[in-house]
């Protein structure tokens, strides 16, 4: 059982989500009540929902990317039909920029921007019975050096059999037309440790 389930649908099994681990790392005392569950595009949405709901979460946070937006929409719809009392929070690049390419109207909350800190604050409020008035929460970019690092939360299995991403900076110095990172205008490097 986990009060908070962090999940996403990776493009392939070999991918290990940096975003989920970054959010998990910054949950602080809520980490003891949280769990990461990753899926890939080849998994059936019904199987994903069953695995998530078996953990009896109060809150499900889902990372949304260009490759999984349609599947996430289906997953959210199924979760809401089967367990309408579960709070669904979406974050990630596909919900951070307007206009939304996919309708996520069934989700309870959308976290736009860099949501590591805001997601934890939202969970604290929800678990204490204090939901926010707004459905869309705008996350201000945190100071990168104030963020807890996600790397301790990769498992030995991840390290041996999956791709482990390293984030050296936030933002991108390039302005590629096809990429959402082009909308971020500032590069903020992490300190080398």
Q: How should these model regions be labeled?
A:
Residues 13-19:
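Short N-terminal binding/cap micro-motifs at the start of the first secondary-structure element
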Residues 1-5:
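Extreme N-terminal starter segment of soluble prokaryotic enzymes
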Residues 148-193:
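Radical SAM [4Fe-4S] cluster-binding motif and immediate context
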Residues 17, 66, 113, 169, ...:
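Short, solvent-exposed loop/helix junctions and linker helices
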Residues 8, 19, 23-26, 30-146:
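Glycine-rich beta-alpha loop elements in corrinoid/cobalamin-binding modules
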Residues 6, 10-12:
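Solvent-exposed loop and edge beta-strand segments that line ligand/cofactor-binding
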Residues 13, 67, 97, 120, ...:
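Tryptophan-centric aromatic hotspots in well-structured domains and transmembrane helices
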């Amino acid at each position: 059982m986990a009060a908070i389930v962090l999940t996403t649908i990776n493009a392939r099994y070999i991918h290990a989500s940096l975003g989920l681990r970054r959010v998990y790392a910054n949950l602080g005392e809520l980490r003891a009540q949280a769990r990461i569950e990753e899926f890939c595009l080849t998994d059936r949405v019904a199987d994903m929902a069953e695995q998530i709901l078996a953990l009896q979460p109060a809150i499900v946070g889902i990372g949304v990317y260009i490759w999984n937006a349609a599947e996430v929409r289906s997953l959210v719809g199924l979760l809401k039909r089967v367990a309408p009392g579960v709070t669904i929070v979406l974050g990630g690049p596909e919900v951070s920029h307007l206009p939304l390419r996919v309708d996520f109207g069934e989700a309870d909350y959308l976290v736009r921007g860099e949501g590591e800190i805001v997601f934890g604050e939202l969970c604290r409020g929800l678990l204490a019975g204090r939901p926010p008035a707004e459905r869309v929460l705008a996350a201000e970019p945190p100071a990168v050096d104030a963020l807890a690092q996600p790397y301790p939360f990769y498992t030995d299995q991840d390290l041996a059999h999956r791709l482990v991403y390293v984030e050296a900076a936030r933002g991108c110095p390039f302005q590629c037309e096809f990429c959402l990172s082009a909308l971020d205008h500032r590069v903020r490097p992490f300190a080398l440790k």
